Amino acid sequence: MFPSNNLYPTKYSVSYHPRMKLSKYRLVTQRISRINIMINNNQLRKIIMSKIEEEIKKRRTFAIISHPDAGKTTLTEKFLLYGGAINTAGSVKGKANSKHAVSDWMEIEKERGISVTSSILQFNFDGYCINILDTPGHQDFSEDTYRTLMAADSAVMVIDASKGVEAQTIKLFKVCVMRHIPIFTFINKMDRDSRDPFELLEDIENVLGIKTCPINWPIGSGKSFKGVYDRDEKTVAMFQSISTGGAKAAAETDLGIEDPQLKDAIGEDLYDQLLEEVELLDGASEEFDQELVDKGELSPVFFGSALTTFGIETFLHHFLKMTSSPLPRNSNEGLIDPVSEPFSAFVFKIQANMNKAHRDRIAFMRICSGKFEAGMEVYHVQGNRKQKLLQPQQMMAQDRSVIDEAYAGDVIGVFDPGIFSIGDTICTPGKKFRYEGIPTFAPEHFCRVVQLNTMKRKQFVSGITQIAQEGAIQIFQEFSAGMAEIIVGVVGVLQFDVLKYRLENEYGCEIRLEPLPYNYIRWVKNPEYDLSELHWSSDIKKVKDMKGHPLILFQNEWNIRMLLENQKDLELMEFKKN
């Protein structure tokens, strides 16, 4: 018996000899056949695993966070331009005859010129497969943003150079810190009058509590904006203003900091100022440390102008090198490795009626490990059942494309017949681990919902329940009542408008919303506490959520403190996990 001369794959063979009994020859050939099958299977498995690892290492999945109007949507579209996913950028406006941003697809978004849902956008650039989780920038749609951040491996924080850190940015930043994910800062709108860049860095460090490391540095701002200095390359990229809706920016002219042409190009005053600021940065600013970036303790900072496409390509190149491919994710059985483990994912978003004509419901899943293949059977852990994921697709805002495969780091949408909930784990049959739950954040505004046409009770209950399951609103009931009286809680008041709009346009139900005087809600942490025995002031209201968990509504923080001082056995939580 000897190896064949076919080097790939390795095979073994045997030659028949007249002295060998035929039965023994057959036995040997059968054993050799089994060995060859095992060798081929092992080699094939290695090839497949190598391909999976190669695809996963190309993935970069990140969210973009910002305060409203900081330029997040514009930056997102310029990324797509460089990736070839779109040809022109649409400017988000409220007029019916205006172009709309690719990432804004719901009718109410197009009418108002805002993003109210999270979009998932995928494109290829420079050998990477990039997944952008484009989140609502409007202050009234932060809860969907919170959940989307749970699916991201890193975040790009967009800051308006004229305003610095704003309220919405602070809220979203806290979620990133909670997850310890890398945070990259893009200070936008440098072509407009802006604050001093040193003030902006100080603002980020003092307000957000994270160290900063400028990768490039602006030369002037507004009408005197001349470009940015690359601290690593020691060159200046000269600013060129182009059409705001155009394709890629013109090639940037790079000049060395000691090049005589640079002083002529930007003027002597700005040149001297640049030299002083670079010297100050080199002596006083934080040094770049990849380990601190990975821990979310140091934020690399970039300056540019998304509207004029200046600094976008430079940012992309740096960002893709500094951020990592999908990392192991926590579960109740420990860390799940994205490469060595088979397919697994978790649901972070549910969206109904993305196609009004089909009344569909899509569950968005972040793949955490392995490879997904269309038609594969998976195990739904929370449902304790095997399930085929039907109609797998990837999204480019409202556009869908059916897919055959996807890898760790990707986000896919699958048809949901009503069995999935936010936070559910999906994995390969034989596995039963659960990924960490996604927090439900406390709403800050509450209304009593009154149905105007009682003949459409069935449609009303179906519609409001489905919208709640998507996570757009939270439904509460009187603690001792049923669905007769429904209280809706939202993170931002504009979500009430979305609720009314969707119930009327998608379910044909008109409602009236009656504001309630409560601003805080807390979940009861200790299940043994009997909320029915609690008799307190009229400043609180006892309710329960859709799963029967007890909660208390408060008018102010003083009510919370007084109740906890009086009820020593009562424990409250600001959020709960699904």
Residue ranges of predicted features:
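Hydrophobic residues within membrane-embedded alpha helices
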Residues: 3-4, 23, 27, 163
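Intrinsically disordered/low-complexity terminal segments and short unstructured peptides
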Residues: 9, 28-31, 168, 234
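Residue-level detector of bioactive/disordered segments in secreted/extracellular proteins
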Residues: 4, 10, 18, 284-285
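Intrinsic disorder/low-complexity signal
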Residues: 10-11, 20, 139, 398
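Short, positively charged and aromatic/hydrophobic N-terminal segments
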Residues: 8, 15-26, 34-41, 45-46
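Structural and coupling elements of P-loop NTPases
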Residues: 5, 36-578
